[in-house]
């Protein structure tokens, strides 16, 4: 079994769609996420994951300069992640197929976790 990170990215379009949602629409969207993640967990493939707030800090360079970030000007904003344990990358991609982020023009990046203890 291999671990993969499913990295969720909101585009400016998807971020605007979230901002325009009524509380009822937001709850319906949250229910879709919970259903999708619950399905992955029910298969025993969920390792963990979280949603991320839109603001944070960025530390850059050898002087480790701290600035506000991520930047609003960016085309994509990392909005959350899941870590899954599956047989191969194709299975990780298949799990991402039902992600609700696609409904609002967001994307999922599937990345293998690097094993460092081998």
Residue ranges and their predicted role:
Residues 1-118:
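Conserved, structured core segments of small domains
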């Amino acid at each position: 079994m291999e671990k993969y990170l499913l990295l969720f990215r909101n585009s400016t379009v998807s971020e605007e769609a979230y901002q325009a949602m009524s509380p009822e629409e937001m709850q319906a969207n949250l229910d879709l996420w919970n259903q999708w993640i619950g399905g992955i967990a029910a298969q025993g493939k969920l390792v963990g994951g979280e949603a991320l707030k839109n603001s944070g800090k960025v530390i850059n360079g050898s002087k480790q300069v701290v600035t506000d970030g991520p930047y609003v000007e960016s085309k994509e904003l990392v909005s959350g992640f899941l870590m899954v344990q599956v047989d191969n990358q194709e299975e990780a991609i298949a799990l991402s197929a039902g992600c609700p982020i696609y409904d609002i023009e967001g994307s999922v990046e599937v990345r293998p976790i690097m094993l460092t203890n081998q």
